[in-house]
């Protein structure tokens, strides 16, 4: 789960880190009111969980409440990398002396936490690694030992602050908070970029990112609730699929894929790629899928504006071919207004009954997956 910036900053604040005053706004009127409350200039920041907001026009500076209002009218509803802006975080502008980078990740190879620190900030760590790799400091933390003073000293010294200074103490607080968030919230990433030294000499996180392990969300009901209320980085189709109970991942192609089992579904995608097509999605209905689940899966792709062809590839064990066929038939009966072509390869339990049902409604059937994939690609190019 990717937290919005305002949510990540709330965690930083909860763990004792000073951040610039700011509030969340859902309308232009709220933006103006917040700007009046905290004082201008302010920064308007689109709350979408993707990198590169600034370059996409998702971060603006306003000198007056009225300017903030006018800018926000243009920002609400804008599309940034496929995500629609529905929230703006309005925060006090901070004059910056210099920008730094600090993140904490899990290094799976060493089974340790890993701090990445650089005196260069405000750009992606990948860009720093490419242009100035010597500027990146790596500090490993063994979880069985925990964060120690020598870890903190190593990081702060690299960032260029003197022991005993105000900046040293403030940076230490940020490092400690990041580590506690990482552990307490089962995070995969905690990052501040830039970590700024202000003109007043204070060390302040101007941006914050936190990614929490989805498998640990059951331990954090507040985050689970927030995810239900705001799906954030998942599309409307992914949100619907999750609600129904099948595994769905959005891609950028035009051939819809439905399979049973992750391995078969991925192999089906590979076949489509092999024959020159582009999958629109990964959709695994799972083992033993019912007629109802199949119907909802097919409806997702029938309603998807980018999908031209739906390729259903089923190998039935506990998944019955007749149930799959009836699900396809039901979906087509419910979604009458569509222009999609459907290609089916179906084998296994109750195969003959399933094929008979599909033949009655004119669905093309194929004996092997290769021929079915070729046909799907061919139809998508028409």
From Swiss-Prot:
Residues that coordinate or bind ATP: 45, 52-54, 94, 99
Enzyme class: ligase
Source superkingdom: Archaea
GO molecular function terms attached to this record: ATP binding; magnesium ion binding; succinate-CoA ligase (ADP-forming) activity; succinate-CoA ligase (GDP-forming) activity
Every ATP-grasp domain range: 9-240
UniProt-listed Pfam families: ATP-grasp_2, Ligase_CoA
GO cellular component: succinate-CoA ligase complex
Binding site for substrate: 260, 317-319
EC numbers, comma separated: 6.2.1.5
Cofactor: Mg(2+)
UniProt KW keywords: ATP-binding, Ligase, Magnesium, Metal-binding, Nucleotide-binding, Tricarboxylic acid cycle
GO biological process: one example: tricarboxylic acid cycle
Pathway: Carbohydrate metabolism; tricarboxylic acid cycle; succinate from succinyl-CoA (ligase route): step 1/1
UniProt catalytic activity: succinate + ATP + CoA = succinyl-CoA + ADP + phosphate; GTP + succinate + CoA = succinyl-CoA + GDP + phosphate
Bound cofactor: record note: Binds 1 Mg(2+) ion per subunit.
Key word Ligase present: yes
Record: residues binding Mg(2+): 193, 207
Function: Succinyl-CoA synthetase functions in the citric acid cycle (TCA), coupling the hydrolysis of succinyl-CoA to the synthesis of either ATP or GTP and thus represents the only step of substrate-level phosphorylation in the TCA. The beta subunit provides nucleotide specificity of the enzyme and binds the substrate succinate, while the binding sites for coenzyme A and phosphate are found in the alpha subunit.
Known partners and oligomeric status: Heterotetramer of two alpha and two beta subunits.
Similarity comment: Belongs to the succinate/malate CoA ligase beta subunit family.
Protein name as catalogued: Succinate--CoA ligase [ADP-forming] subunit beta
Organism encoding this protein: Pyrobaculum islandicum (strain DSM 4184 / JCM 9189 / GEO3)
Lineage: Archaea, Thermoproteota, Thermoprotei, Thermoproteales, Thermoproteaceae
Gene (name only): sucC
């Amino acid at each position: 789960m990717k937290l919005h910036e305002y949510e990540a900053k709330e965690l930083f604040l909860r763990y004792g880190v000073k951040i610039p005053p700011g509030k969340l706004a859902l309308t232009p009127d709220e933006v103006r009111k917040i700007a009046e409350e905290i004082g201008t200039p302010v920064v308007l920041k689109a709350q979408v969980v993707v990198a590169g907001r600034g370059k996409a026009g998702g971060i603006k500076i306003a000198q007056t409440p009225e300017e903030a209002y006018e800018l926000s009218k243009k920002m609400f509803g804008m599309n940034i990398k496929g995500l629609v802006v529905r929230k703006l975080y309005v925060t006090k502008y901070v004059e910056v002396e210099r920008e730094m980078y600090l993140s904490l990740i899990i290094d799976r190879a060493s089974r340790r936490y890993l701090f990445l620190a650089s005196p260069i900030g405000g750009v992606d760590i990948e860009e720093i690694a490419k242009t100035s790799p010597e500027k990146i400091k790596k500090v490993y933390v063994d979880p069985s030992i925990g964060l120690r003073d020598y870890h903190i000293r190593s990081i702060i010294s690299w960032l260029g602050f003197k022991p005993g200074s105000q900046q040293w103490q403030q940076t230490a607080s940020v490092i400690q908070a990041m580590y506690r968030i990482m552990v307490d919230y089962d995070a995969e990433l905690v990052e501040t970029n830039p970590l700024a030294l202000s003109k007043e000499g204070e060390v302040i996180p101007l941006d914050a990112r936190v990614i929490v392990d989805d498998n640990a969300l059951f331990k954090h009901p507040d985050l689970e609730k927030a995810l239900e209320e705001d799906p954030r980085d998942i599309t409307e189709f992914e949100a619907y699929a999750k609600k129904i109970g099948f595994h769905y991942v959005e891609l950028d192609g035009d051939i819809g894929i439905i399979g049973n089992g992750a391995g078969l579904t991925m192999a089906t995608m590979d076949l489509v790629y092999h024959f020159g097509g582009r999958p629109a999605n990964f959709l695994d209905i799972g083992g033993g899928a019912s007629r109802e689940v199949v119907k909802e899966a097919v409806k997702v792709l029938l309603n998807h504006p980018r999908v031209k062809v739906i390729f259903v590839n089923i190998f039935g064990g506990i998944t019955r071919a007749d149930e799959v066929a009836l699900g396809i038939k039901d979906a087509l009966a419910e979604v009458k207004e569509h222009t999609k072509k459907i290609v089916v390869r179906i084998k296994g339990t109750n195969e003959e009954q399933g094929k008979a049902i599909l033949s009655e409604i004119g669905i093309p059937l194929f004996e092997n997956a290769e021929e079915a994939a070729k046909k799907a690609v061919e139809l998508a190019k028409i």
